[in-house]
Amino acid sequence: MDTIVLDQRGEVFSFFRSLDMLCYAIIAQQYFQDPTVLLLLLKVFVQLSYLTPKPFSQLNALPLFYPLLLNFLISLMVRMFFNLPTAGESLDGYLYGGSIINFIGEKNESSRIDFITSDLVLFCLQIFMALILIASNKRPTQASHIQASQSGLSNVDGDEEPSDLITEDSRDTQQGQRQEDLQRQLENERSRLIARFSHSLYSFQHGLSFGSPQNRNTPLQRQSADSYSTPVCIEVDSEDWKDLVWKSQYATENANTNSINNSPLSSNTTGVPNSVLTNPI
């Protein structure tokens, strides 16, 4: 079960990273058509600050919608009220960049619709990434709150000692057990990756054969769907849209528990560090 959870989070991260690279590609393409350095720096700053995947929680107190909307409105005003870029006769009608050198020239655009359409596509893609970011960070936070409430009820109903009376020896024992669980999980993942690499290497070496005792698949045949993990599904509901426009309650909760969740010795039900579960992307 832990392996499937890690595989699903890896798929979400890969998908989110692909969307991030697509946004940077659109920004670069816009700069090739309109070599304005200020617009380039503004778009890269917004994308890098709010949407690019990072190893820590990206939900801030400020909603993600307003920086993205401000970026789009500034670009729209520049397209509407300023002249289009022009290339001189010496450059044969091609733009080769401004302060940043472009070795491959772009044909001079004669219509503002192309620029506005490109800005609109970038804005919609960034909104989609923000919704995925909010929805993916909301599920682990809700699960952690449910787990904390259940543990609190068990501590009240049971005969456990108060937290003030826990000795240092018991804390050291719990930390040692958590380290052993984490080490066991890492060993299992390492063994699984080594086995997968060995199987891939064997298939690559015997790919030209029609079959082998260990691999009966033809070189271009896909494996069955049962051999893969269940595809991850992120649902975006009306609450996610509200969190996109208004202040997200999960941003405050993640900020308050950031120091606890970043600890590799924090306990959880899967044996994976809470920093991985709290920040899936």
UniProtKB/Swiss-Prot annotation:
Domain of life: Eukaryota
UniProt keyword terms in alphabetical order: Endoplasmic reticulum, Golgi apparatus, Membrane, Transmembrane, Transmembrane helix, Ubl conjugation pathway
InterPro entries: Dsc4-like (IPR038967), DUF1746 (IPR013715)
GO cellular component assignments: Dsc E3 ubiquitin ligase complex; endoplasmic reticulum; endoplasmic reticulum membrane; Golgi membrane
Acidic residues composition-biased segments: 157-167
Gene Ontology terms describing biological process: protein ubiquitination; SREBP signaling pathway
Name the UniProt record assigns to this protein: DSC E3 ubiquitin ligase complex subunit 4
Quaternary structure note: Component of the DSC E3 ubiquitin ligase complex composed of dsc1, dsc2, dsc3 and dsc4.
Record field: compositional bias (Basic and acidic residues): 168-183
Location of the region described as Disordered in the Swiss-Prot/TrEMBL record: 145-183, 256-281
Membrane-crossing segments per the record: 22-42, 62-82, 84-104, 115-135
Membrane topology type: Multi-pass membrane protein
Function description: Component of the DSC E3 ubiquitin ligase complex which is required for the sre1 transcriptional activator proteolytic cleavage to release the soluble transcription factor from the membrane in low oxygen or sterol conditions. The complex also plays an important role in the multivesicular body (MVB) pathway and functions in a post-endoplasmic reticulum pathway for protein degradation.
Compartment(s): Endoplasmic reticulum membrane; Golgi apparatus membrane
UniProt KW Transmembrane helix keyword: yes
Biased composition (Polar residues): 145-154
Pathway stated in the Swiss-Prot or TrEMBL entry: Protein modification; protein ubiquitination
Gene: dsc4
Keyword GTP-binding applies: no
